């Protein structure tokens, strides 16, 4: 009697586990969203805009020094483990991918130019 119950239950559990493993096999993490930032005339994207993201969202920043003169810039995100990095000459680009934290406001800045930067707001929609 016990064998009659155990074998069908075991078979169902094995099939369920196989179905879950098969379903999860093809799911890679979503590609990060790309955000392009231009540094020129002591501003990011001309106006130092506020960016809005969702918790857990992966963002790939492509930050380019678009100065027409020999002005060096760098890029950091305070509180997200993205340090200033080396100075970027005009025409150079830095790429950084981050996963947004649960919530909060985070400053993005050029470390060498006070006032050059803005805010990233992480909140649920």
Label the predicted regions.
Residues 2-9, 15-125:
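Extracytoplasmic copper-binding redox domains, predominantly the cupredoxin/blue-copper superfamily
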């Amino acid at each position: 009697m016990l064998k009659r119950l155990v074998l069908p239950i075991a078979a169902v559990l094995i099939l369920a586990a196989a179905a879950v493993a098969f379903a999860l096999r093809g799911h890679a993490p979503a590609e990060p969203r790309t955000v392009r930032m231009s540094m020129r005339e002591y501003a990011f994207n001309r106006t130092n805009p506020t960016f809005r993201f969702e918790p857990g969202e992966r963002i790939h920043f492509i930050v380019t020094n678009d100065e027409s003169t020999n002005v060096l810039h760098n890029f950091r995100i305070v509180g997200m483990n993205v340090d200033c990095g080396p100075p970027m000459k005009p025409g150079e680009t830095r790429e950084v991918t981050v996963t947004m934290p649960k919530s909060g406001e985070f400053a993005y800045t050029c470390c060498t130019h006070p006032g050059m930067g803005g805010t990233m707001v992480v909140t649920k929609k």
